Amino acid sequence: MRCPCFSTILLTAVICGFSVSAVATAEEAWPTFRGPERTGVSPDTGLLTAWPEDGPKLVWSTSGAGRGYASLAIVDGKIYTLGDGLSTTDDEDEYVVCFDQATGKQLWASKTGEAWNSGKPTWQGSRSTPTVDGDRLYVVTPHGQLICFQTDGKEVWRRDIKEDLGGKKADSWGYSESVLIDGDKLVCTPGGPQHTMAALDKMTGETLWTTARAEDRGAGHASMVIASIGGTKVYVQTTGSGAMGVRASDGKLLWTYDIKKTTAVIPSPIVRDDLVFFTAGYGTGGALLRQVPTSNGEVKAEEIYPTTPALGNKHGGVVLVDDHLYGDTEDRGTPFCAELMTGDIVWKSRGSGRNSASMTAADGYLYVRFSNGTMALAKATPEEYEESGSFKVPGSGRNPSWAHPVVLDGKLYLREGDDVLCYDIADS
């Protein structure tokens, strides 16, 4: 084969507080980008607090994920991701791929369409993490194909986000959202002023409602999250124009928080109770809003602090642990810790890896994946950044390691281009 090792960009995310409805049937599952509640925080406990010099035990590694930036969805003993030019196929097209969680064996691969070959070589490839719901899974290709598959790989329906829904991207890097499943609805972000957000029947793909945000620049790369404000369910999302809140029942645009035009808006928002934190890179920074109920099921957003460049994050994502935010400074490989309510930086430190860092959290620790292939473990504390282990991921270093890590059931799962690796991190 063909494609050297690639991993994840244009994806990001994070929330804390509200669960995503109807995305998993198993108790132990990671059914969409950044997990069941889209927090990037795993419920796992009893994990290693330090790693050996060469890293935790490698349980298995497998090939056949293809070129791509997508992370992993894990449900009912199966792992799903998106990639193109798989080492297990004889073409360069894009596929949704399924692996056995226990062994890493590839179970099936179903074609979605053409590969994404636009832009710099290291920015090409697949990028949307699948969303799994019961016996179905949903993917968005970079070209804007929204496809529903059965979990055995059979295609059920597809919609073209650009052609069918008038979608528009705010940049030239393709679509990468992981769609939201909420009850019977699939909710996605076509982007643009006509159909900024859309809700579809998850079983048939039929359009239920769309939301228009005047002069919206187009979809970014975030995956939306859910809030509940005074009895009103709100879908919170960011586009190329900034943050927005949409009433879940009918798609009514409730509020917007506009930002200046920037290169790309990638990280997903963080929701805790009535608070919304969102951030973007390229000098934009992070802001904190409070959602306030008004009347007749409407909600407004009030600014607690404005976009603060010190809180900027390009694509590695930010996690909220207790009352502090943790993320990479832009894409510099310099993790930061900040107070959620004030935005004040508590610490900022260089880690053992280099370049951009994506992270997840579990059991009071940060799992920091630097794009040069270094995987690090650090305690999630406002006191200081101190690593208690790091290792070089096999096969890394040829291209950026951008796929977000997943911690589930005592294991650390990493996507490294065509390879998926499983590590035992249980403290037993």
List where the protein language model places each region.
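Bacterial N-terminal signal peptides
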Residues: 7-21
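Noncatalytic, solvent-exposed loop/strand surfaces
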Residues: 23-428
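N-terminal secretory signal peptides that target proteins for export/translocation
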Residues: 1-7
